[in-house]
């Protein structure tokens, strides 16, 4: 089994309460922006890079830094996903808010991107944990 370390960001616009999602080419599902952590890259750097590469949105990651200012931001969580080939993807997930209010674009890894509210999320083709995580973020992080 090959292990892949990844980073992703649940980007939430606090004004509209919408979540930013990209439509993944391989899965044909809407997912949070993210991807593999590159060599000599921290999870935070990968999360910020992937969010800018895919939908072209710059974000500020939310979370606490313990115990020193130069420590990493505490992620929302770590997800474990296994693909059809048996590869394990360990995804360090963050919450972020957009710094720039520009329209999203599409990368070579996705077919579409957009902002969705809670009602729209109910009808999108997403993995179940996307809806669960959105509700948790709205309840515990964004408030």
Q: What is each residue range found by the language model?
A:
Residues 2-6, 25, 32, 85-91:
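Short connector loops at helix/strand junctions that flank enzyme active sites
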Residues 56-102:
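Active-site segment of metal-dependent pyrophosphate-handling enzymes
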Residues 93-95, 104-135:
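NUDIX/MutT-family hydrolases
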Residues 17-60, 66:
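Conserved Nudix-box catalytic region and its N-terminal flanking loop in Nudix hydrolases
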Residues 136-141:
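C-terminal alpha-helix
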Residues 1-18, 92:
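Conserved N-terminal beta-strand and adjoining loop/helix that marks the start
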């Amino acid at each position: 089994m090959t292990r892949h370390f990844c980073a992703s960001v649940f980007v939430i616009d606090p004004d509209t309460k919408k979540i930013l999602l990209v439509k993944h080419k391989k899965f044909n599902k809407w997912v949070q922006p993210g991807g593999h952590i590159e060599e000599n890259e921290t999870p935070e750097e990968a999360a910020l890079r992937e969010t800018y590469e895919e939908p072209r949105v710059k974000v500020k990651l939310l979370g606490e830094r313990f115990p020193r200012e130069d420590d990493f931001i505490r992620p929302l969580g770590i997800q474990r996903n296994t693909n059809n080939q048996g590869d394990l993807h360990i995804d360090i997930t963050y919450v972020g808010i957009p710094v720039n209010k520009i329209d999203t674009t599409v990368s070579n890894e996705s077919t579409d991107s957009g902002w969705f509210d809670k009602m729209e999320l109910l009808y999108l083709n997403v993995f179940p944990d996307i809806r669960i995580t959105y509700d948790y973020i709205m309840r515990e992080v964004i408030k």
